[in-house]
Amino acid sequence: MNITILSKETIKPLAPTPHHHKYYKVSLLDQFAPSSYMPFIFFYPNKFADRDAAGILTQLKESLSQILTIYYPLAGRVKDTVYVECNDEGVEFIEAQANGSLSDFLKQPDIAALNNFLPRNGNGLEKGCSISPVAIKATVFECSGIVLGVCIFHKVVDAAAAGEFLQSWAKIGRGSKETVELPNFTSASSLFPPRESLSSKFVRDFDNFFFQGSKSFMRRFVFDATAITTLRTKATSEKVPNPSRVEALMEFVVQHLSTAFKTAKSETPETLMITHPVNLRKRIEPPLPDSTFGNVIWLAFAFYDCDPSETKIKPGDVVERVREAFAALDKESISELETDDAFTSLSELLESVYTNEKIKIYRFTSTCNMGFYDVDFGWGKPVWVAHMGNMVDYRCKQQIVFMETGHMSKDIELWLAAEEDELSVLEKNAEFLAYATPNPTIWLDSDGTN
């Protein structure tokens, strides 16, 4: 597959941002977010014999200009750790052409090629004094199938807010009569005021926690609904009789990844550290609306002390620790996040973890139930929403992402970034493969014509 860039242009808001909105104040939680782009890749087959690809690209750009008037911080530039300058500099929009058929690509998805659909490096450490919060790349196949690659800067929004933005853009794009809900730009920074300055040591420790210099390779696996039900049953315990889908999958993945690590490296870590971001919008009192802009998340930290004599983590052990970590983020602990004590504790934790080679970190996240399969611009919902390909320079190591597989589907995709020797062991593990299908075909709807 060859992709040729045809044009690059900057899409600016349809109307100028008012002067009193020139600076968007970030929150403390934004400051704690990774300095990287979140990648999302949407695949839209051609369902119409007379599809006008050029007209669709124009529609995308015009609707983007309209939504940027509402989501004006995304058309600005991240200038420092406290503010986004809402200067209407705009969003880069790249048009590209791919040879071949989209359906052929989806029959056997080339994970390593996915980065070609993105306008930026996904999940890489970004440094600079003027970072664009959003970048778009639209790639049209010869069959008029379209792939939309979106990169959104994590220090401005979390995945839930990104989903709200993309669904709102799609509503305008398809001419929906539904009202686009106005984003709430003030609640997050009011509840969690930013620190006017962050020490260089904290920034360094934070970057070292999330980003490491080794190359990570991406793999995609799919757990069908039957497999997930079985794994939930296996993960039950007296303390957690009803593990969620994500909790059960987290335990299963940690069980087999830790085994793969021990086999590949011939060593056993002393402790496993398992993290997962938690959406705080509904945990805050009173709850915040889904339209709350920014990062309104906090990491849940779970720890598992390894026993060298154990060949495998016992069923239910990881789920219990993860459930306790989630439960610890209650109203009281959330209210204390902006205190000096909490800041000091986080700083000490980050430093102790990244400097201790005996701690193995598994960083989980999930985009399930965030509406990414509802991003319909008028030519149907995407048949696939993908993550990204391999991570080359300063990428998040041991990144584990759960994603939905389609609209109304009960299956879950696992996107796993790890070192090649660990992945090689995992891909030969019959017990793991009994539940996880490696990179299956993406099936088009029955009326897909490409």
Curated annotation (Swiss-Prot):
Source organism (scientific name): Alstonia scholaris (Dogbane)
Involved pathway(s): Alkaloid biosynthesis
Protein name listed in UniProt: Akuammiline synthase 2
Taxonomy of the source species: Eukaryota, Viridiplantae, Streptophyta, Embryophyta, Tracheophyta
Main location: cytoplasm
pH dependence: Optimum pH is 6-8.
UniProt KW Acyltransferase keyword: yes
GO BP annotations, alphabetical order: indole alkaloid biosynthetic process
Keywords: Acyltransferase, Alkaloid metabolism, Cytoplasm, Nucleus, Transferase
Location of the motif Nuclear localization signal: 218-225
Family: Belongs to the plant acyltransferase family.
Name of encoding gene: AKS2
